[in-house]
């Protein structure tokens, strides 16, 4: 009878995985509420944050290598100079988040939402950012190599002084996307229609076969 009672109690009182564990590599904060926390200079490598809420938290100079942040809420969080090599941020949300100087390599950001986020001076390599909402993201002075923006919303994104190598624009929405003074000759699957929607200038370098639209430079 005692065993049955213990089993019933355990079923009705599930333990939240690791929410009160101290921060360290390989921990599990899945589903945890960690809003407005000071978590700078943390080693979160290999840790799990799936469905966690990290909104408004400071995560600067932290290590997220191989971490899982699926459906994690990073709204207005900061992760300046943090490392996300091999991290999974599928369906994560980072409205107005700040990732300036961050390193993302082989990172999964499919179906994520980062409206008005900042990735200034970030280094982003071999990363899948397809089918995502990236309106007004600031990539100024960032280095992007092997990034897929396939079928993502890039409206009003800023690529000022951004280095773009092997970046895939197939099906991306580029309404008023800023490419002034940007070299686009090494990008992939960029169409004339996408250029017509975007904002560039006479210093924008275009791939072979494409031309400067009559609407450049934009008035806004």
What positions do the PLM features span?
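Tandem repeat scaffolds
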Residues: 15-220
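Cleavable N-terminal signal peptides
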Residues: 4-5, 15
């Amino acid at each position: 009878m005692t065993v049955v009672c213990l089993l019933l109690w355990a079923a009705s009182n599930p333990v939240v995985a690791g929410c009160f564990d101290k921060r360290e590599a390989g921990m599990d904060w899945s589903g945890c509420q960690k809003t407005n926390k000071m978590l700078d200079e943390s080693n979160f490598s290999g840790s799990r944050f799936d469905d966690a809420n990290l909104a408004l938290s400071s995560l600067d100079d932290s290590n997220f290598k191989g971490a899982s942040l699926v459906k994690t809420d990073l709204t207005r969080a900061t992760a300046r100079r943090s490392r996300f090599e091999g991290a999974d941020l599928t369906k994560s949300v980072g409205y107005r988040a700040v990732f300036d100087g961050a390193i993302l390599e082989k990172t999964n950001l499919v179906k994520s939402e980062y409206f008005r986020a900042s990735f200034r001076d970030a280094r982003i390599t071999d990363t899948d950012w397809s089918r995502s909402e990236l309106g007004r993201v600031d990539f100024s002075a960032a280095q992007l190599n092997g990034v897929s923006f396939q079928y993502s919303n890039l409206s009003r994104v800023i690529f000022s002084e951004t280095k773009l190598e092997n970046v895939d624009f197939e099906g991306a929405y580029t309404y008023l996307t800023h490419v002034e003074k940007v070299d686009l000759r090494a990008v992939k699957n960029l169409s004339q229609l996408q250029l017509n929607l975007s904002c560039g200038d006479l210093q924008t370098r275009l791939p072979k076969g494409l031309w400067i639209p009559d609407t450049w430079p934009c008035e806004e």
